[in-house]
C-alpha cells in the first residue's frame, strides 16, 4: 500500500493508525513492543520514530510505502 504525506515526516505510531493497520495508539504500541514492525528492513522499537518519504514499513505481510504528496512542507 502507498501512503502519501505532505509533511517532512510522520511518527511510526501515527502512520500505523493513518494506514488503518491499527485502530488506536495502544495497538500500535503493542505491535512495536512485540517487534512486529520493521522500517527499511530493520525491526522498529520506537513508536515515535520519524518515518519519511521513501521509507518502507512492514507489519506482517502488509507493506507500506511512504511517499511525498509533492506539496510543500
Task: Identify the function of each model-found stretch.
Residues 7-53:
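A basic, amphipathic helix-loop patch mediating RNA/tRNA/ribosome contacts
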Residues 44-73:
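C-terminal structural segments of small proteins and small subunits
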Residues 2, 18, 34, 61-63:
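Low-complexity, intrinsically disordered short peptide segments enriched in small/polar/basic residues
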Residues 1, 12-15, 64, 72:
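Small beta-barrel nucleic-acid-binding modules, principally OB-folds
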Residues 1-7:
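N-terminal beta-hairpin/loop module of FHA
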